[in-house]
Amino acid sequence: MFQEIEPHVYCNDFALVEPESSDTVLIYRGDSVLVSVVDGLLSYPTCGAFALDSSSGASVFLFSIDSHAFFLAEIDDDEVDAFVKGSSYSFFRTGALHAYGPQENVFAGMMGYTYYAWYDTRRYCGRCATPLVHDATERMMRCPSCGCMEFPKLFPAVIVGIVDPSTDRVLVSRYANREFKSYALIAGFAEMGETIEQTVHREVMEEVGLRVKNLAYYTTQPWPVSSSLLFGFFCELDGDSSLTVDHHELEDAEWILREELPCNDENYSLTRDMMRVLRERREGDFAPLAADNDTERNRSHE
């Protein structure tokens, strides 16, 4: 998956670090990042290209990969456009970076977007509208007027691979009103007051009207596009396989043969990685949770 950058080491410890000319600066416009792609390899501008230094005050340290520092900067559009003109740089959608390499640079550009999206929406206090200032000791925006503190937020969500044991088919869906039209697995965000296992039962019932059992935890993945932490689960159909599709969320859903699941060598997302496991019939390698007592809650959503 895209976050697997070993042997490189990602470190997100907060520090008041000043940029050096050889450090990397990540510059975003909407959901796109400024990048150069040469022979399939990604690179980002250096801080020196925009004269970012300790006196500029225009950047914030994000993280390091190995010993190399990455900064986020808000630079005047005219200055960026002048830099881009006649260069190999352009703005790429962060969601498309996975098609290139090296993996650590793909990860940097995608994770940088999570930081960018958070900082971009934390300019003013949500309580009193005073401009926020960055805390000096941790990654937190503080209101100098009312003291309100804003920490980075991750939104927990689930990806669910559902198998019908009686037919050995897998449930897939397509999102409604989205550009992405390939097969996906059932997915959704956790709501306040529920466990992540309860999220699985609720989302499956809401989106396709099914009950499931034997939840088996697979793995997690940070997902920058939605600032989410994804939890992957495999499970089995419990009862009737007839689908009641929520067309506000899904364009359609269907049971398909395992061999029909999309598969390629990238597997950059948790969804694609789980589809690979399902194609290879390896979901049984992951033991069901010792206690999954959400049957009654599941039924309450029918």
Functional labels for PLM-detected ranges:
Residues 60-66, 141-143, 160-162, 223:
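Short acidic-hydrophobic surface loop/beta-edge motif
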Residues 141-184, 189, 211-212, 235-237:
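N-terminal strand-loop-strand
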Residues 221-244:
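Active-site-adjacent beta-strand/loop module that shapes the phosphate/pyrophosphate-binding cleft
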Residues 174-175, 187, 216-221, 237, ...:
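Active-site proximal loops enriched in glycine and acidic residues that flank catalytic Cys/His/Asp
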